[in-house]
Structures are given as C-alpha cells and as structure tokens.
C-alpha cells in the first residue's frame, strides 16, 4: 500500500498541485496498473494463492486439483446476489473460492479467478451494484459497458488465453456508457474486447443473468462455445421500453394514458422479441437454466469443453 509507481513524478506533472499520482491508490483505481493492493503479509499470501492456481504455461496441467465440493450444489442465493458478481461468483466456485484482480479499477466490470471441478477458471461479469462488508449497497452502476471496463476485461481475456485458462462470463449489459468522454474511447475499447473473445482458443462459456441488449452484448463473450440464459433474461437489440416508444410512437402520442400503453407494448415486445425463450428459439442461447443450477451447468460445460482444440491458419497477428 505504501509503494509508488510512476512514469513522471507527480510534482513534475503540469498543473498538478495536490494529487499524488504515484501512490498505490491512484495506480489501482485510476490508472488500472495494479492487480492487487495490500499490506506486505496479505500481498505475499495473494502471490502464494496465484502461484497455486495458475498454470506454468499454456500446456501445463499442474494447476488442476481434486474437487471436494459438490458439483451439483444448488446456488440458492445466486439470483439475489447477481447484481454484485463479487458475491455471486464465489457461490458458483468450488468451496466459495474467488480471487479478484483489479478490484478498484472499472468497478462496473468484475474480473478474477474461480475454481470449477478443481480447474482454474477466469471469470468476467458486469456489475450493477457494489455491496460493502455489512451487506449494504455502497455503490450502483447503470448496467452499461464503459471503455475502462471493456479494456479491463480484454486484458484479462488475453491473459487467460495465454495460459489456456477457460473463461466464464456472467452477462448483464444494457448498452454502452453514453458520455462525451466515453465517446472518445468506447469504440476502440469495445472492439478490443470483442476481438479478444473471438481470438481466444480456450473454452468459453457465457451465462446471461440479466440484460443482453444492443451491440454491447456482442462484446460480452458473444462467441462463447456454450451460451446459457436465466429465465428472466432480456436479449435483443434494445430494451423493450425503448423499442415500444420507437415502434408505436404515433399511437403513444395519441393515447390518453401514455404510460399504460408503453407498458403494454413493452410487455408484448419483451415476450415476442426480447425474452430468453424467444432467444432460445432463434438459436442465440443453447439452453435456459434455473439460476440455482448455474454451478452445475457451468461445470458440466467446461468438462465437455476440456479437450477443445482450435487450429488457426499460419499468420502473424491481428490489427485490432
């Protein structure tokens, strides 16, 4: 926590009078350069944990361990905790193990490692709420994909693929964050995330736990080997309310009770076009699963994909 990291010394930065850009807090939460911030004893323990779960290389199998947890264990509280993946991912993992990386940076996107059937799995999830140690809501997010979140996830995907670590995603995204600052970076950041997932040769499993709306959903592991959805998930080009307002603009303008008509049309659109059932009928998802069976289904999917091999044509590298 007392370490310093910088390219230019804080007092050498033009216009900077007060902010210490070299301390661990800044490099962790603002720059995204630091994976873990802790005191020395905690940091050493984190390193030991990482060494024990990460393979030595992309062909190493020494990171696998015997699973003592029930693979069919029901995650009864998973749906209630879905807003904060820092709570829901441990429920899916063997013995509630979860090692989060870059937890202070781009908090709308959660990245870390879990264990399934004794195997190390990279986990990526959208966050809409952050809860403190007392279980109280400390911070909320709007469900959109930010440039920082996309970059954070893309770097994590590349790391996992370098070691052939499978990746599980819990998708809940409504669109891209819409601000002038984000507009400068979001296109390139989203492209990097989409490319990272498509370029990945290790097993990929996607579980849509909430919304998968618009082109932002394409960035969240759209190229997964197996895709599942919870029954209440909404999957489509836009959220049902926005779609209803566009499609029935003339009717809404003439209606006496506009809100009632919007709700009616949105519900009809959601059932016909944006429900998990309609997505399954179109082949967008492989199966609709109950939230409490997520651990069981994910473990089975990764077991099936364990021997996945993907041959690539001889070339140098992509340009994204």
Annotated model-derived regions:
Residues 1-320:
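Ligand-binding clefts of soluble mixed alpha/beta catalytic domains
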């Amino acid at each position: 926590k007392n370490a310093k990291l910088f390219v230019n010394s804080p007092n050498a930065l033009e216009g900077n009078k007060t902010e210490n850009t070299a301390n661990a807090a800044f490099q962790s939460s603002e720059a995204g350069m630091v994976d873990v911030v802790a005191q020395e004893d905690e940091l050493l323990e984190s390193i030991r944990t990482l060494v024990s779960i990460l393979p030595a290389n992309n062909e190493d199998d020494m990171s696998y361990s015997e699973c003592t947890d029930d693979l069919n264990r029901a995650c009864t509280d998973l749906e209630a905790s879905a807003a904060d993946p820092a709570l829901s991912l441990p429920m899916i993992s063997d013995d509630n193990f979860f090692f989060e990386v870059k937890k202070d940076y781009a908090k709308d996107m959660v990245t870390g490692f879990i264990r399934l059937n004794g195997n190390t799995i990279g986990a990526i999830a959208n966050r809409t709420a952050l809860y403190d140690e007392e279980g109280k809501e400390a911070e909320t997010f709007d469900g959109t994909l930010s440039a920082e979140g996309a970059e954070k996830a893309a770097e994590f995907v590349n790391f996992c693929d370098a070691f052939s670590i499978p990746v599980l995603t819990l998708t809940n995204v409504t669109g891209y964050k819409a601000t002038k600052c984000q507009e400068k970076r979001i296109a390139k950041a989203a492209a990097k995330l989409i490319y990272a997932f498509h370029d990945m040769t290790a097993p990929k499993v996607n579980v849509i736990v909430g919304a998968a709306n618009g082109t932002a959903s394409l960035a969240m592991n759209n190229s997964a080997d197996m895709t599942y959805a919870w029954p209440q998930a909404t999957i489509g080009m836009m959220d049902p309310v926005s779609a209803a307002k566009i499609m029935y603009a003339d009717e809404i303008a003439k209606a006496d009770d506009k809100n009632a008509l919007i709700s009616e049309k949105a519900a009809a659109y959601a059932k016909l076009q944006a429900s998990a059932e309609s997505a399954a009928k179109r082949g967008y998802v492989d199966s609709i699963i109950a939230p409490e069976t997520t651990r069981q289904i994910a473990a089975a999917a990764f077991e099936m994909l364990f021997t996945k091999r993907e041959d690539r044509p001889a070339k140098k590298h992509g340009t994204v």
